[in-house]
Structure formats: structure tokens, C-alpha cells
């Protein structure tokens, strides 16, 4: 009897003699699958570590999202190449037609393999999307910028971690938002990577950064110039280099000023330079430390040009005319390397170095400013020279105040680690801070009394233009930190109402 029912599909004749599964059985494909499998396993493990870790390791992110995915891709390409080559060889052997490719969706085997292939592709695309996003996040992280190239960026990373902007990511200032600056930063970063690999990068890293994004697009996202006004009290503590470390305190009222006409201080204070109605331009050398020419355009459009006397206009200029913005004064808002004199003063004012140790200021500054080839050599010298000084000059102090001397050594080592980097030739002298004028020219780059206009106007050097000295005293710091304050004098005699709260009368509306 003949069965007239439907027959299950059979293997097409062109595929007789081999099965797809056997296409994996070649050295190229097996090698590619092994490489891809190992890479994928490591990616999964490292990604889990990276996601669950409180403090990601820079090398974990580098391997998980950048290095290992490249090996995974190479492995998959090798596997595909091996399958194609094996299939090509067998088709030629069976039919003589290497281009013969047929997929029969009515065939159960073809259906299952197509579904499996599509599923693998979908999973791979999803994993690739996750990995690509994590790679993007990683390359924008402070960990990537500051810790991956440890020896190169160590000074910048250390300064960032101890700055007022420690919680602000590198890209917030160096890149900002938007695709165009992101692309520019990555292109610039590629050039820097090449220099790092070839060991041709400058030591120290050159500043100011060329083509840095304008401060109006970065700094002003948080520090809006229209919301600056008034004055600030600044207290400066200094210690002399004598045996007693004689303290001296200077109190200044810094005339910060502002740029908001609504507050009635649109033309007052230091931030007059950044007033939205004023335009200050200048020419200088590449380091922006020697300014030869200044042009001021006031709110009415009047233009005044000032030229430094005693030199030709632009003789040493290497940059084009630049409009003044935040970073022309605040040029070290994050990567600041404090001078030893300032650092030791702060440590003594905070009693991290005892001010009662003889010659503590002198010895601390001397040991920090000495020349060393490596950080390790410097730390060892600090640990040796300070105890040796007191043992030789003040044997009783060396014996009775051993704890204070050890604390001094520890603090000086901390100061050195955070501010001086001999391997990269970085210290306070290589990166001047333009805020103020105590250790660097800063304000005096323009306010030196030598910049004159054709009409005879001179950029002022009057100290009181920017700050007012409230008092200067010498003595024991705890005695001079607190000054006697004057009692508030009410404009109207209150009589028996002196104990009444201000808000009982002043309600914000019509006065009493």
C-alpha cells in the first residue's frame, strides 16, 4: 500500500554529505570561539566587579569596556571566517558552486538554526549597547582622566582630589555638554595618548590649556556672574622664620563686587572685570604672565587702550588678542600647587605643626624647597633632616617633644606629596596662581602702574581698589583671631525694647 500523505521535508541535495554543525570543526573557528569565550567570560566578571564596586578601579573599566571587547570582536570575526572558509570548501567539493546559498524556512533544521542565530545577534547587540554606554561613561570619568595614566596625570589628579572642586568631574570643566566639544576632546585625547605611548609628552604638562572651552560655557554653569556682589572677609595667618615662629595676622575686606545691575553694584569690586557690560581684552605671552597691551570697552562703547611702558607692543606676545574671562584670574581653581611657605603657615595655624617648636617654620620650608630627584627621596629626607635638626640644636626638645616632631614630619610629607612632583617637574613655581599677588604677579600683570593709555590714563596700582586692610597684628594667634566687635547701634532709640527680636517689628512690609 502506498502512503499518499505529506512527507516531511528532506535535506536539500545540495547539502548532502555535510551538516552545519560540522562547519565549526576547523582550527580557525575553534580558535576564534575560544578567544571570544574567554573574552566574554572576563568581560562579564569585570563588569560585575565594576558595577558593584564602591570605588571603580581604572584598569577594571579599561579592560571590561575597551580592551576585552576588542578581543571578543576579533574572536567572533575569526570564527565567522573559519565557518565561511569551511563552507566554501565543502560546497565546491559537493556542487562546484561556491556561491550556492539556500535557506528553506519550511525545513525544521533551517528554522531552528535561523532562530538561534537571530537570538544570538539580538543578545550580542544588547550587550554591545550596554558595553558601549559603559565605555562612554568610563572615558568621561575622573577615574579614567586622572588615574589611568598614573605617572602622567598624577599631579593633576592629586591637586583635583584636594581642591574645592574635588566633587566636580574633569569633563564638567574640560569638555562640558554637547557633542562637538566631546568629539574635540577625544581627538585631542588621541594625540595625547600617542605622546604617552611614545613617551614624548612634556614634563610638566603645558599650561594654560590651548583651546580650552570658554569659561562662560563651563564655570558659569555653577558660578553665575550676575549673582556675585558684596565683599568678603579674608584672614591671612603668617609665621616668621625666627626661633619663636612669631605669628602675624592680616585681615582684609576683599571687594569682590558683582555684575548684576539689579543689585546696584554693576561697576564695583574685582568682578568689575567680568561685568557683563564691560569688555576687557589683552595680549600676552604664551603663559599669560606678561601682559603688554590691554583694551577696555565700557558700557557706552568707549574704547581705551593701555600699553605697558618700557617695551614694544607685542614684542614678546605669542597669542592673539584674548577676551578676559574667569580663568584669567582663577587660573588654578582645581589644579593648584601651594607654595611651601603658604602650606607650612596653614599647617601651623591649624596646629598640625606645633608653632611652639623652635624654628618650625624655617626648617619646614627649607626641607620642602630642597631639590630632590624623586618623591621617595624627598619623603626620606624629610623623615631624616627634621629629627636630626632638633637632636643637634635642641636635644631636650628632641627628647621631650618627640610626638610633636613626628607630627611635623608627617605633615611635611603630606604637604610634599600633594604639591611637589619631581618626576613630572611640577611644583608651585611651574604653575603660578593669578589670584592675588603675594607669591606671583597675579593682579600686578596689569595693575603695575606701568600700563598707560595715549591720553595719559594709568591702570591703577592702588591697594584699596581691590581690598581694604582692616588690621594687622603680631602675637599669639588665639589672642588676635578674635577682635573686639562694636555693638550694633539702632538708628532709632529703642529704650526698653532692646531685648525684642528684630522680626517682631521688621515684618518685611511697612515698617514700624
Please provide the spans of the model-predicted regions:
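Juxtamembrane/interface segments at transmembrane-helix termini
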Residues: 81-91, 131-140, 345
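Eukaryotic non-globular interaction segments with acidic/serine-rich, low-complexity composition
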Residues: 2-21, 373-388
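Polar helix-capping/helix-linker motif
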Residues: 20-29, 107-110, 141-142, 163
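Membrane-interface interhelical loops and short amphipathic "cap" helices
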Residues: 49-62, 143-153, 158, 162, ...
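Hydrophobic alpha-helical segments
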Residues: 6-89
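C-type cytochrome heme-c attachment and multiheme electron-transfer modules
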Residues: 100-134, 143, 168-171, 175-337, ...
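Extramembrane terminal tails and long inter-domain/linker segments of multi-pass membrane proteins
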Residues: 2-18, 92-110
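Non-ligating segments of multi-cofactor redox enzymes
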Residues: 31-45, 60, 64-67, 74-78, ...
